[in-house]
């Protein structure tokens, strides 16, 4: 019994070590005015643009421009963008050695006129002072500012994403107890000044990378550019995989198939240990009916400790109710299923399908 207590204690502590301090955007505004060009790569994003663009038109600071890059959409993406009065860019046919999102971002950057470039995914929503706070952080830190949006989850089904959001934050390794440099940059929201963007090669330098901004962050740090990562808590939001359980399952399978090989060793060890502890709890629960009271009490205490931990960690990451935290055994088992299938995608099939395009999964991320 003592060995089990020690084992579960170590696994539980790993959860705190992997997300010791999650940095959020400061409320401090910039000292100087900045011209910001917002660039939105959009492939079949008609519905999402209707949510994002109104939040951009209502910002506390005046934007230089908003550019929507139509990445070969077959819905009303372009029409919706024009209805909101933003600039629409339609790139030439996708070159054979480029992936879609880097190509869209690169073309948007070429048309931009601002001194700061802000790349946003179409499924985001920004608080009224969100971009001003991003500018403030860029002014204080320089280089590249990267934000993982706060995940708004409304249904119980959507809250199955909780563990995945925790792992995504932990994988960046800059929020661990050891405060290491970021593993790269988050994909959905990235701000960089034009001069630095040009010097590091922009999206042309990572044109074949599936996780383009993760790789761009690495390229930037290799050239001694500062990369600072934040949670989007109370500033930048998104809502993913609200369409149903199937979309949620395969969406996270795709993300983990593409990202697992890029995770540094330290956060990988911490997250594997933590997940292992959670799965151990989930597997053990049915057997508590036939165990002695001391065993039941021990497992019950760790069940509550994991629930409290998940609720605490999720505060700055995404929506999470007490009921959702208490149902963590189902979350850990669901995570296991997704991880197994993502392993099959990455190691056996070696490709995933996303927005109608087949994407090869390889060490270099080549398409």
Tell me what each language-model feature is:
Residues 34-37, 65:
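Cell-envelope/extracellular polymer assembly enzymes that use nucleotide-activated donors
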Residues 273-349:
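Membrane-embedded multi-pass helical conduit in multi-pass membrane proteins
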Residues 62, 70-78, 93, 124:
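A conserved acidic beta->alpha catalytic loop
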Residues 105, 117:
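Short aromatic/hydrophobic "clamp" motif used to bind/position activated sugar donors
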Residues 54-63:
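Short, acidic, metal-binding catalytic loop of nucleotide-sugar glycosyltransferases
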Residues 76, 122-137:
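Acidic donor-binding/catalytic loop of UDP-sugar-dependent glycosyltransferases
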Residues 138, 144-146, 150-156, 161-169, ...:
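Catalytic donor/gating beta->alpha subdomain of glycosyltransferases that bind UDP-sugars
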Residues 1-32, 175, 335:
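N-terminal membrane-anchoring/stem segments of glycan-assembly enzymes
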């Amino acid at each position: 019994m003592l060995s089990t207590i020690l084992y579960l204690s170590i696994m539980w502590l790993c959860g705190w070590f992997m997300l010791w301090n999650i940095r959020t955007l400061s409320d401090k505004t910039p000292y100087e005015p900045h011209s910001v060009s917002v660039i939105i790569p959009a492939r079949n994003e008609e519905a999402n643009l209707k949510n994002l663009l109104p939040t951009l038109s209502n910002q506390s600071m005046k934007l230089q421009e908003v550019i929507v890059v139509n990445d070969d959409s077959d819905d009303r993406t372009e029409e919706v963008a024009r209805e909101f009065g933003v600039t629409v860019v339609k790139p030439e046919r996708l070159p054979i050695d480029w992936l879609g999102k880097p190509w869209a971002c690169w073309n948007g950057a070429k048309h931009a006129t601002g001194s700061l470039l802000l790349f946003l995914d179409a499924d985001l929503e920004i608080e009224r002072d969100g971009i001003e706070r991003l500018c403030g952080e860029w002014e204080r830190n320089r280089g590249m500012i990267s934000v993982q949006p706060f995940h708004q989850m409304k249904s119980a089904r959507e809250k199955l994403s909780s563990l995945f959001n925790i792992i995504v934050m932990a994988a960046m390794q800059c929020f661990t107890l050891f405060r290491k440099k970021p593993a790269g940059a988050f994909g959905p929201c990235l701000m960089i000044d034009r001069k630095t963007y040009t010097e590091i090669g922009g999206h042309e330098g990572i044109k074949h990378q599936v996780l383009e901004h993760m790789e761009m962050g690495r390229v930037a740090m290799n050239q001694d550019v500062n990369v600072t990562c934040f949670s989007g808590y109370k500033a930048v939001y998104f809502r993913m995989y609200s369409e149903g359980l199937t979309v949620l399952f395969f969406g996270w399978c795709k993300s983990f198939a593409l990202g697992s090989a890029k995770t540094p060793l330290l956060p990988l060890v911490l997250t594997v240990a933590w997940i292992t502890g959670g799965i151990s709890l989930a597997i053990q629960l049915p057997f508590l009916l036939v165990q002695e009271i001391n065993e039941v009490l021990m497992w019950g205490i760790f069940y509550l400790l994991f629930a409290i931990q998940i609720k605490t960690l999720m505060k700055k990451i995404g929506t999470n109710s007490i009921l959702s935290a208490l149902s963590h055994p189902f979350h850990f088992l669901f995570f296991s299923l997704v991880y197994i299938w993502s392993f099959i995608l990455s190691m056996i099939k070696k490709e995933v399908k996303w927005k109608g395009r087949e994407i090869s999964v390889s060490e270099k991320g080549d398409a």
